[in-house]
From Swiss-Prot:
<keyword id="KW-0784">Thiamine biosynthesis</keyword>
<keyword id="KW-0949">S-adenosyl-L-methionine</keyword>
<feature type="compositionally biased region" description="Polar residues">
    <location>
        <begin position="1"/>
        <end position="13"/>
    </location>
</feature>
<feature type="binding site">
    <location>
        <position position="571"/>
    </location>
    <ligand>
        <name>[4Fe-4S] cluster</name>
    </ligand>
</feature>
<dbReference type="InterPro" id="IPR025747">
    <property type="entry name" value="ThiC-associated_dom"/>
</dbReference>
<feature type="binding site">
    <location>
        <position position="279"/>
    </location>
    <ligand>
        <name>substrate</name>
    </ligand>
</feature>
<feature type="binding site">
    <location>
        <position position="483"/>
    </location>
    <ligand>
        <name>Zn(2+)</name>
    </ligand>
</feature>
<dbReference type="Pfam" id="PF13667">
    <property type="entry name" value="ThiC-associated"/>
</dbReference>
<feature type="binding site">
    <location>
        <position position="442"/>
    </location>
    <ligand>
        <name>substrate</name>
    </ligand>
</feature>
<dbReference type="InterPro" id="IPR002817">
    <property type="entry name" value="ThiC/BzaA/B"/>
</dbReference>
<dbReference type="GO" id="GO:0005829">
    <property type="term" value="C:cytosol"/>
</dbReference>
<protein>
    <recommendedName>
        <fullName>Phosphomethylpyrimidine synthase</fullName>
        <ecNumber>4.1.99.17</ecNumber>
    </recommendedName>
</protein>
<keyword id="KW-0408">Iron</keyword>
<feature type="binding site">
    <location>
        <begin position="376"/>
        <end position="379"/>
    </location>
    <ligand>
        <name>substrate</name>
    </ligand>
</feature>
<feature type="binding site">
    <location>
        <position position="415"/>
    </location>
    <ligand>
        <name>substrate</name>
    </ligand>
</feature>
<dbReference type="Pfam" id="PF01964">
    <property type="entry name" value="ThiC_Rad_SAM"/>
</dbReference>
<keyword id="KW-0862">Zinc</keyword>
Amino acid sequence: MNIRSNPDTTRPAVTTGGLPSSRKIYAVPATAPDLRVPLREIMLSEGAGEPNLPVYDTSGPYTDPGVTIDVNKGLSRARTEWVKQRGGVEQYEGRDIKPEDNGNVGAAHAAKSFTAHHQPLRGVGDAPITQYEFARKGIITKEMIYVAERENLGRKQQLERAEAALADGESFGAAVPAFITPEFVRDEIARGRAIIPANINHGELEPMIIGRNFLTKINANIGNSAVTSSVEEEVDKMVWAIRWGADTVMDLSTGRNIHTTREWILRNSPVPIGTVPIYQALEKCDGDPVKLTWELYKDTLIEQAEQGVDYFTIHAGVRLQYIHLTADRVTGIVSRGGSIMAKWCLAHHQESFLYTHFDEICDLMRKYDVSFSLGDGLRPGSIADANDRAQFAELETLGELTKIAWAKGCQVMIEGPGHVPLHKIKINMDKQLKECGEAPFYTLGPLTTDIAPGYDHITSGIGAAMIGWFGCAMLCYVTPKEHLGLPDRNDVKTGVITYKIAAHAADLGKGHPAAQLRDDALSRARFDFRWQDQFNLGLDPDTAKAFHDETLPKEAHKVAHFCSMCGPKFCSMKITQDVRDYAAGLGDNEKAALNLAGAGSFGSVGMTMSGVIEDGMAQMSEKFRDMGEKLYLDAEKVKESNKALS
């Protein structure tokens, strides 16, 4: 059911209601009975003969019929109490919103401000604030308990096949356990191998974890530009993206009303929100990178941290000494953030202020538990530039910065390319693990060829599946509009579904113990011709049903034992089922003919094995003719015929 609810006609309309034959359920962790961890239960048809299937759910309360959605008020801020109960924080007035925060937009173009105002929190003193600091001190937070329950997909105990699934996969050194415990989560965060991006000011958040020993996650990018989109569209795209499976969303807005757009998104987002602060900082100085200053950038970090942004992409690895390494590239510097900082460095002939002030950035981000997403500003923008010295020089610097951020108590993940051909992908993963101490890797694709504008969701989905299998923790989606324009909601859905496929394929390859449950359930539904179950178990039930109904639209076709590709006579699965039914109704002599093993004579009837087989085949040939030479027969008629033969 897709209901476009709009409590205020001047505010965003968002999609609510569950996916077909699904319902929102909540798991309750044994160690924290006050927590309710969301899952989506896919309800199978009565004839399925198997239980309903719980799956990971990112859609938040938008698919819970028991929750009234009002985007003007935002979502419940239940997590704020968790933060306050831990202590070590203070509530304060926060900075004033300035005209430049929204690009000095005039009254005629100003978006309506979000209704509610929440005073921000910040850490004080030496008490642990970040999930990394709690983990290092051996403290299991509610967020850690929450994500452990979430990662197990509703399983209360180890699957019977868990060890076999792990053994069957190739994890390339990952250590995926058969069952996720809160202690395992804490240990992975303490080692720096996983993060829970969770700003203390994002009270609406449903915590999730990013790390190669957990389910592979995906990110969806949204955001306005100077020429298109609005607050309404971006809030709608955020809700639409998480409906289809986006684990995090990045707001990459570069036009008017940046602060206001972000506030509406955050107050209505149950998933982590990331940004690239340099984009907004650039808008504050009229789009001229030369005018950027550390003070302006720092103020932007504080502004966004107070709002609740969960992770910042910071291109601190773009150093003055690396810029010349891009001179011989085919496509130069393709990262917006990277090119901004490169121009600043060259204009001032100084080291990047992001690099020289990195310690101070860490101190600021720690106060709010904003996670680092250390940006790859020198990523390759073409196959020809993949794995060059510029790319890897920056990666080595990101490894150095990771250690500094950890020492300051911050959570860190590393961004990666880009455009990389298949044979060069694993080198990227191996080098990132080595240089960055196994901090989670977060890549854009990578795109595996440059020849398919309009289809780069496919060129990148191929690379994403591979690098996810090799150990990449989160995959940033690419839409069909990549390199061509700003994606609309249809492009967002296509990008999300494409990357859910890639992430799931990676989990299957790694041998994640619960990954294959959904595949097997759908395969059984396919073999049993349970069409509705096939649709509903898929990542996109609406499209699957629409494709089926283009040629077989009647309700009777939803129970037919064929589809339009092969028709009723040539469906391999229907033929296989008929063979099974036929075998079940064979008489003893017929079974002997078809199942004899070994050579020699069949003493009880005085015939050789070949004679028995020939006789059996002759009987079946005659029987086929007697029953009208029909390929498909009623099972009861076959059984009656068999009784006459036996």
